[in-house]
Structures are given as C-alpha cells and as structure tokens.
C-alpha cells in the first residue's frame, strides 16, 4: 500500500492522480522508471540531488510531500470513475486543512477538474485556495504524458520560483 508523505507546514504537497501498477507493486510513489517526477523536482531545485522512489521519505527534509487523489491502482488514470475523483478531492481538502502546506500541486488538469468540480482549468496557480494553501495545477510527469522533460521542468519551475519569492 502506498502511504502519504506528509507533515505539518510543508512548502508544497505534490498530489498525484493515483498509483500506477508499478508504483503499487514497488510500494513507492512515482516508481515507474518512465515517470519523470523525481527528475523534474530535482532539475527545478526542490531536491539537492536526484532521489529514488525508495528515498521518498527524504522529501520531508526538503519541505515537500506527496499524496494522491485516489488510492486505487490502475494501468491508466482514465480508468478512475467520477465519484472516485470527487471523493478524492474532498479527501485532499481535508488533508490540506489539517497539514496546511504553503502550496498544493495537483498533477493533472483533467483530474483536478473532475476532483474539484471546476470546468475550466488552466495550468499554474489557481484562484482557489484551501485555507492558506495555494492551489496549483501542473502537468503530470507520467511517461504516458507526451510533455517533454524540458516543458515539465518549466511548469514546475514557476511553482518553485513563487515559493522562493514568498519565503
């Protein structure tokens, strides 16, 4: 079972959609070798070195955490039902109210839209806040996403810079 990597007052909590089969098998977030999450957050500067999925607990030392909208593993996120995503959105709101990070970064526009019931979603900072927590929508780093590593880094860099500016 995949567990949240959360603590009070983190800089950012990255919210994946749900675990893929490789992640579920290995027991670590973003464990599929084709997933670029660990590379992206390192290139942007959230981590000083490239962490492996097995080192996910070290994210807490950097002020970062991980959660997910839905705990059920699937081959593709498109297998998730609308109700699962809505319930996941409600659970994320509760977690953010409890842990109060500076930012929540939901990794996927369509999943964010369905989980939070917002029809028009753009990339980046959202007008929605959860308490004092800023809400961001960033591209999913899954290998199934056609975005290049460079474009993922640019998107995540915007969040990193915003957090640095207000530090």
Swiss-Prot record:
Transmembrane segments: none annotated. GO terms for cellular component: cytoplasm. It catalyses: Specifically hydrolyzes mismatched double-stranded DNA and polynucleotides, releasing free uracil. It is found in: Cytoplasm. It comes from the Bacteria. Keywords: Cytoplasm, DNA damage, DNA excision, DNA repair, DNA-binding, Hydrolase. Its EC number is 3.2.2.28. GO terms for biological process: base-excision repair, AP site formation. Pfam families: UDG. Coiled coil: none annotated. One of its GO terms (molecular function) is pyrimidine-specific mismatch base pair DNA N-glycosylase activity. Signal peptide: none annotated. SUPFAM superfamilies: Uracil-DNA glycosylase-like. Belongs to the uracil-DNA glycosylase (UDG) superfamily. TDG/mug family. Binds DNA as a monomer. Excises ethenocytosine and uracil, which can arise by alkylation or deamination of cytosine, respectively, from the corresponding mispairs with guanine in ds-DNA. It is capable of hydrolyzing the carbon-nitrogen bond between the sugar-phosphate backbone of the DNA and the mispaired base. The complementary strand guanine functions in substrate recognition. Required for DNA damage lesion repair in stationary-phase cells. This is G/U mismatch-specific DNA glycosylase. The lineage of its organism: Bacteria, Pseudomonadati, Pseudomonadota, Gammaproteobacteria, Enterobacterales. The gene is mug.
């Amino acid at each position: 079972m995949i567990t949240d990597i959360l603590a009070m007052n983190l800089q950012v909590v990255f919210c994946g959609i749900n675990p893929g089969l490789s992640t579920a098998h290995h027991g670590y977030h973003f464990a599929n070798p084709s997933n670029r999450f660990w590379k992206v957050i390192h290139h942007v500067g959230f981590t000083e070195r490239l962490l492996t999925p097995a080192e996910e607990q070290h994210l807490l030392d950097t002020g970062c955490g991980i959660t997910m909208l839905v705990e059920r593993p699937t081959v593709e996120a498109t297998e998730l039902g609308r109700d699962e995503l809505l319930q996941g959105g409600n659970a994320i709101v509760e977690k953010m109210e409890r842990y109060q990070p500076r930012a929540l970064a939901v990794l996927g526009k369509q999943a964010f839209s369905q989980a939070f019931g917002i029809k028009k979603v753009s990339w980046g900072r959202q007008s929605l806040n959860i308490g004092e927590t800023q809400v961001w929508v960033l591209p999913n780093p899954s290998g199934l996403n056609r975005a290049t590593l460079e474009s993922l880094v640019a998107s995540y860099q915007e969040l990193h810079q915003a957090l640095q500016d207000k530090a």
